[in-house]
Regions:
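Residues on the lipid-exposed face of transmembrane beta-strands in outer-membrane beta-barrel proteins
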Residues: 16-18, 36-42, 65-69, 78, ...
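Short, solvent-exposed loop/turn segments at secondary-structure boundaries
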Residues: 26-29, 57-58, 90-93, 126-130, ...
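Outer-membrane beta-barrel transmembrane domain signature
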Residues: 44, 109-193
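Glycine/small-residue-rich loop that forms an oxyanion/phosphate-binding "nest" at active or ligand-binding sites
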Residues: 61-69, 74-99
Length: 197
């Protein structure tokens, strides 16, 4: 959630999700997975770590580190994604092939949020000529409430040819259409169980 007034103290968060499948920007990255995360935020700035580890040996393992800033509806961030899988094992120290560095820009208009992401270093994706494609992805999402449940409809696409998303895209391609439902179930005054699908 974004607000015009930034908080005056450091806030910390920690959590983990257990998911039945991991699909990211239209790509199937694994089955049942545990996805822990932690973050710090202060006056609009944030630093977070997030990961995903699947229960199957063939599932993608991932660690993301993100530095971001939000003001009003505007957001900007830089993320270091590290991916490895049984098909393409990679060492964490392999910054050229195992890491993808991405810049993100977004604006939340209230009823609709628009985000743009571009890979700028590491594994940036290549085009049909084998040249760096600086693979990009953009999404438009719209949150709404219905029947006591919070919903988010989202559509995402890659704007030009690259092999980073969905194996290969030879141009503009819609790669994700989703409808997410979420609800928090209050267990105690200080603990809630978030459910989403």
């Amino acid at each position: 959630a974004s607000g015009v007034k930034a908080q005056d103290k450091v806030e910390a968060s920690v959590g983990a999700d257990l998911v039945s499948g991991y699909i990211w920007r239209g790509q199937d990255l694994g089955g049942v997975s545990i996805q822990p995360g932690a973050g710090l935020s202060y006056k609009g700035f944030s630093l977070s770590a997030w990961g995903s580890v699947g229960f199957e040996g063939t599932d993608t393992k991932e660690l993301d580190l993100t530095l971001g800033y939000e003001y009003g509806g505007f957001s900007v961030g830089v993320t270091d994604y590290w991916f490895t899988s049984a098909d393409s094992p990679a060492r964490y120290s392999d910054y050229k092939d195992a890491h993808t560095f991405e810049v993100a820009l977004g604006y939340d208009f209230g009823p609709v949020a628009v985000n743009w992401f571009t890979n700028f270093a590491g594994s940036v994706g290549v085009n049909e000529d084998g040249k760096d494609a600086y693979a990009s992805y953009f999404s438009v999402s719209a949150p709404f409430s219905l029947g006591g449940i919070d919903w988010t409809a989202e559509i995402g696409a890659t704007p030009w040819a690259n092999d980073f998303y969905n194996g290969y895209s030879n141009g503009f391609k819609v790669s994700a259409i989703s409808l997410q439902a979420s609800k928090e179930i209050k267990i105690t005054d200080s603990f809630s169980l978030p459910l989403w699908a």
